[in-house]
UniProtKB/Swiss-Prot annotation:
Residue numbers covered by motif BH2: 208-223
This protein's encoding gene: ced-9
Region (Disordered): 1-58
Organism: Caenorhabditis briggsae
Cellular location(s): Perikaryon; Synapse; Endomembrane system; Mitochondrion membrane
Family: Belongs to the Bcl-2 family.
Functional note: Plays a major role in programmed cell death (PCD, apoptosis). egl-1 binds to and directly inhibits the activity of ced-9, releasing the cell death activator ced-4 from a ced-9/ced-4 containing protein complex and allowing ced-4 to activate the cell-killing caspase ced-3. During larval development, required for the elimination of transient presynaptic components downstream of egl-1 and upstream of ced-4 and ced-3 apoptotic pathway.
Xref: PROSITE patterns: BCL2_FAMILY, BH1, BH4_2
Span of the annotated motif BH4: 75-94
Primary localization class, coarse: other
Name under which the protein is recorded: Apoptosis regulator ced-9
Subunit-structure text: Interacts with asymmetric homodimer ced-4; the interaction sequesters ced-4. Interacts with egl-1; the interaction results in ced-4 release. Interacts with dre-1; the interaction inhibits ced-9 activity, either directly or indirectly. Interacts with dct-1. May form a complex composed of ced-9, ced-4 and mac-1.
Topology term for the membrane: Peripheral membrane protein
Positions of short motif BH1: 156-174
Length: 266
């Protein structure tokens, strides 16, 4: 009986240390009021952008088709492609990944580039986040859901699914998926990650992109601009600048994970 209690206390203390050990977490928690206006993507403006040309259906001139409504731009395709790409970066294969009916689009490739840039800019934070998020496998997916909801539903951006937030969510999800694929216990949750991330983003695109004049065509233009800017600045000491997404991201992860882990031992 004593041995069982000692083991439980030891496990609880281990997880508490894991969630509180990162000095950056403690520092960022002191700035809870910070909110990411563009998910750390300073080169992507969040003010309304000019409308871009869209196609019309051959039947009924009054029916407008936005590019984000086209089947080849189904958001699940973006998530599948990025998750597959990110998992491959770790030398692994997502053997049961859903197929892409229309193949890899140039927009998917742009998302790969921007997601990679986003992760590089937040590499240390991402590593700390994933360590804490996956500390207790039985609650990893539910923790991921809470993080996505908390960050994705923040209201301080003009567009609920801004380009920066879109890139950040897919990039973060891809990193978590890659980490899950390394664990036999967590591999089966990658598809759950895919479905949840896709539905979350799809819902918000349909709710906001029309009103805020967002489109994949505009995403491509701004994405190219960001890539060019990144090439110019990648040798600069970016680490000296504190990113707003990192601030709220660290706060969200630390609070949610620490609370849930402690609760799981009660």
């Amino acid at each position: 009986m004593v041995d069982s209690m000692d083991m439980a206390n030891s496990s609880q203390n281990t997880f508490r240390r894991r969630t509180m050990a990162t000095s950056e977490m403690r520092e960022f928690l002191s700035t809870k009021d910070a909110e990411p206006n563009n998910f750390g993507m300073q080169t992507i403006p969040e003010s309304p952008t000019p409308s871009t040309p869209t196609r019309r259906m051959s039947i009924g001139d009054s029916t407008r088709i936005y590019d984000w409504e086209e089947p080849r731009f189904n958001i699940q395709g973006f998530v599948v492609d990025y998750f597959t790409y990110r998992i491959a970066q770790n030398g692994l294969d997502w053997y049961d990944a859903p197929a892409l009916p229309d193949g890899v689009q140039k927009e998917h490739e742009m998302m790969r580039s921007l997601g990679t840039i986003f992760e590089k800019r937040h590499m240390e934070m991402f590593e700390n986040f994933s360590e804490q998020l996956l500390a207790v496998p039985k609650i990893s997916f539910s923790l991921y859901q809470e993080v996505v909801q908390t960050v994705g539903n923040s209201s301080n951006t003009p567009c609920p699914m801004s380009y920066g937030r879109l890139i950040g969510l897919i990039s973060f999800g891809g990193m978590v998926a890659a980490k899950m694929m390394e664990s036999a216990e967590l591999q089966g949750q990658v598809r759950n990650l895919l479905m949840y991330t896709s539905l979350f983003i799809k819902t918000r695109i349909r709710q906001s992109w029309k009103e805020h004049n967002r489109s994949w065509a505009d995403f491509m233009k701004l994405g190219q601009q960001m890539k060019e800017d990144y090439e110019k600045e990648k040798d600069a000491e970016e680490g000296k600048r504190l990113k707003s997404w990192s601030i709220i991201g660290a706060s969200v992860i630390a609070v949610i994970v620490c609370g849930r882990i402690i609760f799981s031992f009660k």
